[in-house]
Amino acid sequence: MNGTEGINFYVPLSNKTGLVRSPFEYPQYYLAEPWKYKVVCCYIFFLIFTGLPINILTLLVTFKHKKLRQPLNYILVNLAVADLFMACFGFTVTFYTAWNGYFIFGPIGCAIEGFFATLGGQVALWSLVVLAIERYIVVCKPMGNFRFSATHALMGISFTWFMSFSCAAPPLLGWSRYIPEGMQCSCGPDYYTLNPDYHNESYVLYMFGVHFVIPVVVIFFSYGRLICKVREAAAQQQESASTQKAEREVTRMVILMVLGFLLAWTPYAMVAFWIFTNKGVDFSATLMSVPAFFSKSSSLYNPIIYVLMNKQFRNCMITTICCGKNPFGDEDVSSSVSQSKTEVSSVSSSQVSPA
């Protein structure tokens, strides 16, 4: 094995060098130069400085403006809550540990940080699954004219949290474990060792199969069918022009959110699975750290996407920031946009479609 396994850690460097020390007790500057840890600090600070306010503002705007409290927006709020979990309980911890060059909070802190990072990512993924299924049912109409109600939205949210806990909780209960990864200043599930006491292999297969492959397949199936349906409707003029436009644009927004998530998390998933299937392979701490830290950027994608692509939401956010006034004068435009979307709302009971 080209790494060193401890009681509750795995350092990707052989102890033949005599340099390896516990990542809970000593700086890990033998894995990467100190300046690389400072770069991580700057990057995480940027995510905290931008992600925390924009997700809090997303929640504030949604609760303040009654017209935004539509069933499909509940899922978007759920995404914002997941991103806040990651920012508050994941990013802040990673910033401090990277600043010190090792996981200063010990094994318990590592388990907590790994849990919240996994939980936040899973809530985001399963929320996108719910959005994809909603788009498929509303646009493709396999169940007729389906009305997406508040009850359906709350059921979807409950489902996302159930699935997320079923992924993030097992390592806290003895099925696998959370250990420092990469540069040893953030934590994740143990993809690295074959420790029989924790049954790591079965957990990793379960996690990749149930909590990555299946959701991604459902998302791609839903949007594959949806794109075909939108094209058919456009060719046959089955819907009014305004309804077609609104459905296309809300679909485009959700697809961008899915692509943003996949862009952030797929590199991490692929590198982790490669390490898992090639136990003992020689890899640098940076190899795992780069995709691990890049995956955290997903907390910025979703609010930016639906603020940029949803004119009504964007207008509400600007008026909230500017104390009730929109200096860009979009109120009238937003009102007309909202009016034109009532046809979509009558089907999906939602007004998230952008203009």
Swiss-Prot record:
Membrane-spanning ranges: 37-61, 74-98, 114-133, 153-176, 203-230, 253-276, 285-309
Residues bearing attached sugar chains per UniProt: N2, N15, N200
Keywords recorded for this protein, A-Z: Chromophore, Disulfide bond, G-protein coupled receptor, Glycoprotein, Lipoprotein, Membrane, Palmitate, Phosphoprotein, Photoreceptor protein, Receptor, Retinal protein, Sensory transduction, Transducer, Transmembrane, Transmembrane helix, Vision
Region Disordered, annotated ranges: 332-355
Domain of life of the source: Eukaryota
Gene3D superfamilies linked to this entry: Rhodopsin 7-helix transmembrane proteins (1.20.1070.10)
Membrane topology designation: Multi-pass membrane protein
Molecular-function GO terms, alphabetical: G protein-coupled photoreceptor activity
Protein name: Blue-sensitive opsin
Lineage: Eukaryota, Metazoa, Chordata, Craniata, Vertebrata
